[in-house]
Amino acid sequence: MEKKICCVTGHRDLPQNQINYVKAALMREIEKAVADGFTCFMSGFVEGVDQYFVEMVMEKQKDDPSLELIAVIPYQKRLDSLRAKGRTYEMLEACHDVVVIREEYQPSVYSHRNRYMYMVEHSNRVIAVYDGREKGRTVRTIRFAHQMKKELREIPVGEIHLPKK
């Protein structure tokens, strides 16, 4: 049976008043993915949504050690800098695999055509935390997921999507 893979994309700069909402929604999506038979989770390890996702999958691994995490890093020196930080070092240690897209930094290394294209191509489901902006990495990743006919689970954020109290 082929492994079912889920990846995440989302914004770094979430409004402070929505972080708890986003974390709760991400956890629900991860739990749904596990219930739907997903066993492998990919993250680009960018601050914000990507790292919240990793922390939550690590939490789920405590109950289900068969769950795998894969880090997808744009270039080697970025991986080295992540390993130098205590918090991200622990996250990387929890990963089943680390994929480094390029050995050396290049101006295009952060392009969606690298890391995020790789993640979408290798995933069955994409979880997107998205605020409706028409420019940026998140919307390009969402468009690519549509192009590739991947299952897309969207978590809306932004002023027009504030959760009711």
Describe each model-derived feature in a short phrase.
Residues M1-K164:
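Acidic/glycine-enriched connector segments
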